Design a protein with these regions (language model features):
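Second-shell residues forming the walls of enzyme active-site clefts
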Residues: 156, 176-177, 182, 207-220, ...
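Conserved beta-strand positions in the central sheet of alpha/beta enzyme cores
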Residues: 166, 199, 284-285, 330, ...
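Substrate-binding cleft of extracellular glycoside hydrolase catalytic domains
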Residues: 222-269
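Short, basic, glycine/proline-bearing loop/turn elements
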Residues: 192-204, 257-258, 303-304, 350, ...
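A substrate-binding/cap region within the structured catalytic cores of diverse enzymes
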Residues: 249-319, 323
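Short acidic, glycine-rich surface-loop motifs adjacent to enzyme active sites
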Residues: 185-207, 285, 293-297, 369-390
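N-terminal hydrophobic targeting/anchoring segments and the immediately downstream early-domain regions
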Residues: 2-228, 235-239
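Short glycine-enriched loops at secondary-structure junctions
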Residues: 170-172, 230-243, 282-292, 331-337, ...
Length: 491
């Protein structure tokens, strides 16, 4: 049977009606998408304008702009959902009209077509979701880069130099008596020398309440995010155990390797991170990833053991646990102390490993970095078969720049081992050690024995042209990317 419709069959009429209804739905969706794009464009324009405002309002304004962008994204999702609903409604109406006119024999065919349309729509939705996630990530990265660039642009060279240091409260004040309370004297020093981080030790800890108050005050006294760190690998040597404020002994790395495995490593990371977060810390210089090569070495006493592959798996899982508790992990020490011996009393620490030997130990550090470690601590080991002299790795371009930066492609924070060690200050002046570390490619100088002389050494090196401000800005960019990442939604 044929209908009088310009020679068209009933089937052709149904197809044209479906096409018309779908085009109408797509036009509605396109119009909403255009409005959404305009809204997002306005949000991004507001963000860019905000970042260029005066320094005192930059971070707060950036946060407000991000909130506006998030609101726009929510409106986007709602609009897309509404458009999809209208499209489905239009398709349903077309389906009903077809069903009313169709003969019973046509129903299975129409049902199959509709199912194919649903499948195509689901596939398109998944693709659109992936594209949205990618776009959001790119937007977040752009926001973070702008925040970091804005922060650095507003800093004086004195502030920039101070931000390279991660020191104890005693070093900041220039005293030797352990600081157990943080008050006006620390506040004044932090205002004068806005260091990048404060590291605490057992001597700073007298009670759980006092420690929490100290860490809280340190953050209050700083205008910018402050790294507050400690070295805690778990076990009986934890500063929380030795200071007497905790009886909760978390598994040591040696215990993890001997009996607990990857699950135990992750659990230990979670426990360490939870305890650190309880007191307000945000950095743990752990795990110790060195491969043990000699009996009696620090790697043998406190590390995971002699097998690089096992160390890599366990280090990765400890870092995952710490990261899941919002603690920045600082994997240490590269190159490892696994076969090192010290010359005399407090002399240099020597390893006879070659470049090929060292490559066999890369995995634990690289796995920890891949798992989210934000710091890589460079040891004071001297490698004469690699360098040709006894200059420590912490001051060595061959180690930090050639291997870590260029060969590994690592662009996170490189921090020195504690610089108050005799193998450093007996061989180099405080200024020489600080400048040498930055020249070699390090970003932060940890626990210098004399902060004032080290800090002034950096400033003098800039004035003389030995260090450029651009070189310092490279390190600050890495530092502030870590500090500000949590402030950027979606990063």
């Amino acid at each position: 049977m044929e209908f009088e419709s310009g020679g068209l069959s009933r089937e052709e009429i149904r197809k044209k009606r479906r096409q018309k209804e779908r085009k109408r739905a797509l036009l509605v969706l396109g119009g909403i998408a255009a409005v959404v794009c305009l809204m997002l464009g306005i949000g991004i324009t507001v963000l860019v304008h905000t970042i260029s405002s005066n320094h005192a309002q930059k971070q707060e304004a950036a946060k407000q702009a991000m909130l506006e962008q998030q609101a726009a994204e929510k409106e986007t999702a709602a609009a897309l959902a509404e458009a999809k609903k209208e499209e489905e409604l239009a398709a349903q109406k077309a389906e009903e009209a077809e069903t009313a006119e169709a003969e019973p024999a046509d129903a299975p065919e129409e049902t199959d077509v509709a199912q194919d349309d649903v499948t195509d729509t689901d596939s398109s939705d998944e693709t659109a979701s992936d594209q949205t996630d990618t776009a959001n990530q790119e937007d977040a990265e752009a926001v973070l880069e702008e925040m970091v660039a804005s922060q650095i642009a507003g800093m004086s060279i004195e502030q920039k130099a101070a931000a390279l240091f991660f020191v104890t409260p005693e070093q900041l004040l220039g005293i030797e008596t352990p600081v157990t309370e943080v008050g006006s004297s620390i506040s004044e020093k932090l205002n004068q020398y806005p260091v990048g981080g404060i590291v605490l030790k057992e001597g700073n800890i007298t009670s759980a309440e006092g420690l929490s108050e100290m860490v809280s005050n340190l953050q209050v006294f700083t205008q910018n995010s402050l790294f507050i760190g400690i070295s805690d690998e778990g076990g009986e040597d934890s500063p929380f155990i030795t200071s007497g404020i905790s009886e909760n002994v978390i598994a040591s790395q040696k215990e993890i390797a001997e009996s607990l495995g990857n699950t135990g490593a992750y659990s230990a990371g979670i426990s360490l991170g939870s305890e650190l977060k309880q007191f307000g810390f945000n950095v743990d210089f752990a795990p110790l990833a060195d491969v043990s090569l000699n009996d009696g070495s620090i790697a043998e006493q406190k590390g995971f053991g002699k097998d690089a592959a096992t160390n890599a798996e366990l280090a990765r899982n400890v870092v995952k646990g710490l990261t899941d508790q919002s603690i920045f992990a600082g994997v240490k020490y590269f190159p490892g102390y696994g076969d090192a011996t010290q010359e005399g009393n407090g002399g240099q620490i020597i390893s006879q490993r070659t470049r090929d030997d060292l490559k066999e130990e890369y995995a634990p550090y690289q796995e920890a970095i891949d798992a989210g470690a934000k710091f890589l601590m460079i040891s004071h080991v001297s490698l004469p078969k690699i360098r040709g002299d006894k200059r420590p790795a912490s001051l060595s371009t061959e180690i930090i720049t050639d291997i870590v930066r260029d060969e590994w492609g690592y662009d996170g924070i490189v921090i020195t081992d504690y610089m108050d060690k005799s193998c450093i200050y007996q061989k180099y002046t405080y200024a020489e050690a600080a400048v040498g570390a930055i020249e070699a490619g390090a970003d932060m100088i940890l626990s210098t024995k004399n902060f004032a002389k080290s800090y002034n050494g950096i400033l003098d090196a800039v004035k003389k042209g030995q260090l450029t401000e651009e070189r310092i800005d490279q390190s600050l960019t890495r530092i502030y990317k870590v500090k500000f990442a949590s402030k950027v939604a979606g990063y």
